[in-house]
Amino acid sequence: MNENQAIINIETTGIDPHKNHIYLINIFTIDRYYNFYSKNNESEEKIIKSAYKILQNKQIISFSEFDIKFINTKLIIYTEFDVINNCIYLQKLIRNYYNSQLSSLKAKDLAANLFDINIDDKSKSVKLYKKISKSNRISDELIEFSKTSMNFKIKLYNYMRKFFEENCAKFDVYSNFVRYLLYDIKKIKNNLEISLITDNKMEIDAMYESTQIKSQGMFITLCLSLHEGYIEDDFVECTMTSMDNNYNLINNYYPLVINGEFIYDNIKELVKYTLTEIFNE
């Protein structure tokens, strides 16, 4: 972790940012730990503005997209600040490499399975919040709950940093090695959008055959068109279809999505091949 990053944890009274509110924000930076508590709806705006002053120029590390989407909705409601968009979501990273090994990717289950940390159910923290709303005093239980939740996120971040060091792939750009991991995959109509997280900022805007590659900060995105078809049960014969013609699948075609499920090993090989072809020409 460096001085330009911050790990964030929030607790809310529900899942709808228009109806519910944030009552706790924890921020962990390289040299400080911040706690912001809201005892009622009226003080929510104050803690959000205070937290934003710390976060505005940093890369935010969050467990999932929920926290950032919730905060961004509140920023739009209360302020004219820019929304937070420089983020790393730990759940996305772990999904690509441990999805088949873990029965659940929920924070509570990951905390228990990976670190033997017990994160109480969210409903318990909401009950604790309702108590302090009446008493006007932050309870020790709520403070401990937030510390445990943040401790899990810090451990998961360090866990994935170690995983990056041990498992990252590499490609060469102008005699410099760039290390990366698969970060996110989205299927948008007949296109596949593949995001990589790297260990370095770079500027890339290139095309390789039908694949477009662009970079933004520490992220690289590959966008390619998918051919749709069907695969026999034994995966030996496959017919690819387009609007104009039908043709048989040849040996160097690899399925990337089957029945809506991403084939991660094939996607990783495609990324490796594409990057090598582009930058080693």
Q: Where are the predicted features?
A:
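Short, well-structured alpha-helical interface segments that form or flank functional binding sites
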Residues: 20, 46, 66, 141, ...
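Conserved DEDDh/DEDDy metal-dependent 3′-5′ exonuclease domain
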Residues: 31-106, 259-281
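Acidic active-site catalytic centers that drive phospho-/nucleotidyl reactions
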Residues: 9-11, 67, 89, 149
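Residue-level signal for well-ordered alpha-helical scaffold segments within enzymatic catalytic domains
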Residues: 6, 24, 53, 69-73, ...
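Active-site-proximal flexible loops/turns
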Residues: 16-18, 74, 96, 156
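Polyanion-binding interface signature
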Residues: 169-265
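Conserved RNase H-like, two-metal-ion catalytic cores of nucleic-acid enzymes
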Residues: 1-55, 196-202, 211-231, 235, ...
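Acidic, Mg2+-coordinating catalytic module of metal-dependent nucleases/exonucleases
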Residues: 110-174
